[in-house]
Amino acid sequence: MRNNQPVTQRERTFPAQQRLISTTDAKGVITYCNDAFVEISGFTREELVRAPHNLVRHPDVPPAVFAHMWSTLKQGLPWMGIVKNRCKTGDHYWVNAYVTPVFDGNQVIGYESVRIKPTAEQIRRAEALYQRINQGKSAVPQRDKWLPVLQDWLPFILVSQLSFLIGVWFDSHWGFALAAALSVPLG
């Protein structure tokens, strides 16, 4: 994976209404870029056109982000994500990117990317995600992996607790029968 250097800790921004637009061929080589993209990147149009789009790749962005992007695009599907890009000077800028394949019939012949300014919250979440991935951790915190499991088992847990309480209150045989009857509507 390309490692563009140098990098600084200076962030550049662009107006919220501005759109950074570029197109590439099927291999990711830039074929078009608008003035806004040229301006924020710090590269000249001549340096950008015919260069691989990863020219603006910032080394803080984990390779897994781009692997996911390319996997999605090669399936003919659009991809969205918050990406930290590197300027020619080493400064950086954040984008909320929407990348879509360009088709000729059934064949992908290139890609178009429209990027807008992300919110501060989107940037904060992306930085946290990038940091987790770059530290070799799972993209999803371990504690969040239990939520779907808990949601699947919640009706059973509630019924079993209800059964126990009813069993204590009535007598174990009646409590079980009543809890079984109550569990039918819960699934």
Residue ranges of each PLM-predicted region?
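Short loop/turn elements at sensory-signaling interfaces that couple input to output
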Residues: Y98-Y111, I116-R125
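Alpha-helical transmembrane segments and their helix-membrane boundary motifs
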Residues: V140-G187
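PAS-family sensory modules
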Residues: M1-D25, I116-L154
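Conserved hydrophobic beta-strand signature of PAS-family and PAS-like sensory domains
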Residues: I30-T31
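PAS/Per-ARNT-Sim sensory domains
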Residues: V49, P59-Q75
